[in-house]
Swiss-Prot record:
Species annotation: Treponema pallidum (strain Nichols)
Gene: tmpA
Annotated membrane topology: Lipid-anchor
Protein family according to the UniProt entry: To T.phagedenis TmpA.
Stated name of the protein: Treponemal membrane protein A
GO CC, one annotated term: plasma membrane
């Protein structure tokens, strides 16, 4: 093998090595891009699922009706994610979807925070856990400042605020619960001793249901829910007791009014009797039985009955009856009459 052949062989081997290296690099690059694409697809799917759950959670909390403008703004962000996905920019779509999900969860937390703030203020619960109350206020203030600039940090601050507010409510309602339970129980017993009308039964059933739910919540240490249930039951029982007693009072007044009118009528009759007394044993006012004359129709019926009665037939076989009949004819016997008739002949 000459020198030229060796040179050509070396060059060929080098080119082959270079070509193999390039092919290998291209394959690795393609595999890398495919892996990145799969990762983006997974990330996008995860973001979409979280976005859907966050939106449903916000709606179930009532955020869409309590804060319609903010909810509409988040829907606009959600549409941007959909547009990016249509354009094939999965990375942008996933990022925007995560931002929209953060804001939906922030809005949901905002509804719960507002509810806890109202309860804490109404029942003055901050006095039972001042440290947690202060921490809650600080975290919530920070969340409001971060809403427009950093949704992830804003969401974290709302979570911290919620945890602190819940501690305040849990401690405060725990202090107030025994008294509220006792009051609700007393009201329940009070109504149980009353006669509740049929039309008021639905209110009684609602109160009983609230009371039972409060007991169940107390058993699982859900103090806020238990307090709320007992409080609502107390309100219904109290109002129901007022209505039942009012109806009873009205019925008693009506009965007393009727008795008063009856007494007044009796007094008036006695007064009239004293001023113009009736004759003793006056007809219609005597205790003796009254003789009632028959009506004209009754007389007519009596006469017709007499006329229709059969006339008794004389018994001619009795001498006494014949003699008696002869006496009635002028004192002449049948024999003398016959003699007189013969003489005349």
């Amino acid at each position: 093998m000459n020198a030229h052949t060796l040179v050509y062989s070396g060059v060929a081997l080098a080119c082959a090595a270079m070509l193999g290296s390039c092919a290998s690099g291209a394959k690795e690059e393609a595999e890398k891009k495919a892996a990145e694409q799969r990762a983006l697809l997974v990330e996008s799917a995860h973001a979409d699922r979280r976005l859907m759950e966050a939106r449903i959670g916000a709606q179930e909390s009532g955020a869409d009706t309590q804060h319609p403008e903010l909810f509409s703004q988040i829907q606009d962000v959600e549409r941007q994610s959909t547009d990016a996905k249509i354009e094939g920019d999965l990375k942008k779509a996933a990022g925007v979807a995560s931002e929209a999900a953060d804001k939906y969860e922030i809005l949901r937390n905002r509804v719960e925070v507002a509810d806890l703030q109202s309860k804490i203020q109404t029942h003055q619960l901050a006095q039972y856990d001042g440290d947690s109350a202060n921490a809650a206020e600080e975290s919530w203030k920070k969340a409001l400042e971060l809403y427009e600039t950093d949704s992830a940090q804003c969401l974290q601050s709302t979570v911290e605020a919620l945890e602190s507010y819940r501690k305040v409510a849990h401690e405060g309602f725990g202090r107030l619960l025994p008294d509220m339970k006792a009051r609700a129980g007393a009201a329940k017993t009070d109504v149980g001793g009353l006669k509740v009308a049929v039309e008021l039964r639905p209110q009684l059933e609602e109160a009983d249901s609230q009371y039972q739910e409060a007991r169940e919540a107390e058993e699982v240490n859900a103090r806020a829910k238990a307090f709320s249930g007992y409080h609502r039951a107390l309100e219904i029982y109290t109002e129901l007791g007022k209505v039942v007693r009012l109806k009873k009072t009205e019925a008693e007044k009506a009965l007393q009014s009727a008795k008063t009118k009856q007494k007044a009528s009796s007094d008036l009759a006695r007064s009239a009797d004293k001023s113009a007394p009736l004759p003793e044993n006056a007809q219609g006012f005597s205790k003796e039985p009254i003789e009632v004359e028959p009506l004209p129709n009754d007389r007519l019926n009596t006469t017709q009955a007499d006329e229709s009665a059969p006339i008794p037939i004389s018994d001619t076989s009795s001498p006494s009856r014949v003699q008696s009949r002869g006496v009635e004819d002028g004192g002449r016997s049948p024999k003398s009459s016959m003699n007189e008739e013969g003489a005349s002949r």
